[in-house]
Structure formats: C-alpha cells, structure tokens
C-alpha cells in the first residue's frame, strides 16, 4: 500500500462522514464505525483504496450504530462493512446479517492467535479482529509505587492509605464488566468449546465464584470496597489523586493524562492463587450479508486495513490500544500501558459472542449488588443469576 496522506479537505470530510445514504451500492464501499473510534484515520485508508482501485469508500458513524445495523441490514440495506465490539456479532450472525469470512492461514497468522476466537461463531469466522480492549488495574504511582500482586494485599494497603487520608480502591463495583476480574478468578462465564461456547454450562455459581464474591463482601465490610460508587465518581476521585487504585480501560487514559496524574497500568492481581479473568472485547470488522461488494470488502480489509501504515494512521487519529496485527503491536509495546493491557487480555476471557450475554450482564450485576448491599446471600444471589441466564 502506498504512503497514506495525513489529512483530507473539509469538503471531502463532509462527503465521507455526513452522507445520509444507508443503502448498499454495487461498486462502492460503505463503512460504519462508532464516533469514538478513529473514523478520520479510517477515511484516510479509504481514500488510498480509492486512489489505487477507483472504488469509492464512504465512512459514516450513525447514532445507535449497533441497533441500527440490525434494523437496516435485515431489510437488505446498511453498510458493506461494520466495525463494532465482537460480542454483538453473535446476535448479528444468528440473525443471518453477517457473511462468513475465509481468510487464508497466511493472513490468520499475521494476527494474534487468541483474537480469532472472538469472531468464531459456531465454528465459522464472522469477522476480522482488529483491536483488543481489556480493563486493567490502574494505580497512582505517587501513592502506591508498586501495584499489589495479590488482592489479599488490600487490607495492608488500606492501613497505609488511611494514614495518608486516601482511599485504597474505587471502581464501578455494581457493573459486572469491571468486577468480573475479581469474582471470576479460577472460574469462567460460559464453557469454551471447539465451536464456540456451551451456553448451558456457566460458571458464575461455581465454588470458586462463590468464594470470590465472599472475598469481595469481606472487603466491603472492612470499608475497603464501596459498592455505592459509580463509574463517574470513581474516575473523578482517582484522577484527583484521592484514591490509590481503580479498575478501568484504555479509554480512561486520556483524562488521566490531562489531569497530569502519575499513574501506571498493571496486570491484575491474583486471588486465591488464581489469575484474574477480565473480559476481553475485540473491535472487529464484519461484512454484511446484504453487501453486493464482498470481494471489494475483503480486499479493503485484508490488503489495506491490516497493514502497519493503515493502523498507524487510524491510531494517530484515535488510539486503538493493543492491536491484533503482530507487527504493529510490537511497535506499540514500548508503551508500558499497552503492554500491560495485552497481558491482561492474554490472561483474560474473550467476551462470548452469544445472545445469552445480554442476560448475563443484568443477572451477574444484580447478584453482585444484592450481595454487597445485604439483600441476598451469596448462594441465593448467584443461584438466581444462574437460573435467569439458563432460561
């Protein structure tokens, strides 16, 4: 691929980003991506593709993209290529909205191995994994020079922080996504199989899961963990230097940088000698079943998007975090934050791309909240969640 230009004219941007057409057009590529991603960088890649092939590429970021795609693709309209977190791809595939993709082994080997698991649905690949999103333990280096290796160290850290008038840790505890690394240590969400997941085999009510939630309840009773704190308050308190640690993802780094905080990103501590298992989300590219441009979409994705130059352009627009393309990821790992994110991703659990995850989020979150607020016992809360998910 030729060297990418670094800017587009205002007119070109307006054409690429605000065009209202939702219908697929033969001989042109329409791409949808969320507005918080590097859509301007992606448009640069599209411009290069157009220069080389004569095929026009339109990049759009419609509101409520993930639900709108389901609506319009079902009627034969919408984009040729959609970018979204992989966990939504399972429901798209079940509805017949995504094409199976068949990249060569040579191409597959260019990407980090475990990332392909994210787009494996019933033994078929339904997209191309692009960027890896995993939460991490973020710590204030001025308050805590070294992060803990085990969660069992929290009471000792609490004693030190209390003497300084600071809090030990804050995060959005009631949100199962952020709390899963702790409560899942040594357990799992859905049983992994060769073809995907066994939705009838879930681990949220395993013996390990009950022990982990008991630990979290103990930390709450000791005043170390506060289940009443929401995401915004936790993020603000940490950015202001009032808390030693938080649990958050790469999207939070920008605000911490702006705040001038001296922070580090670490691998999660172990609990009961078991590694923490954060859920791993993969920004992925899927090809719509309604697209008449399958060959063009594959050409764009495999030979233009998945190159060091293209990913650098997108990353310069808005950071991708860790990426699946091995060559570009190696160039990013001089950033210790990205290296730690990748470690947590490798230790973590790919978010299952199955419809049952929609119930999981509500049921597991409610179980955590009810236990920590004293409304249910651990046994009752997790049994209820398990029953709801298995319905």
What are these regions (language model features)?
Residues 126-130, 135, 155-201, 243:
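Extracytoplasmic/periplasmic solute-binding protein
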Residues 344-391:
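Conserved C-terminal helix/tail region of periplasmic/extracytoplasmic solute-binding proteins
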Residues 86-136, 146, 151-158, 265-266, ...:
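Hinge/lid segment of periplasmic solute-binding proteins
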Residues 158, 198-228:
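Glycine-centered hinge/linker elements that transmit conformational signals in sensory
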Residues 98, 251-254, 283-359:
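Mature extracytoplasmic/periplasmic domains
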Residues 45, 214-293:
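Extracytoplasmic/periplasmic substrate-binding proteins
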Residues 61-69, 87, 152-153, 226-240:
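Short helix-initiation/N-cap motifs at beta->coil->alpha
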Residues 8-12, 22-89, 105, 272, ...:
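Conserved N-terminal structural module of periplasmic/extracytoplasmic solute-binding proteins
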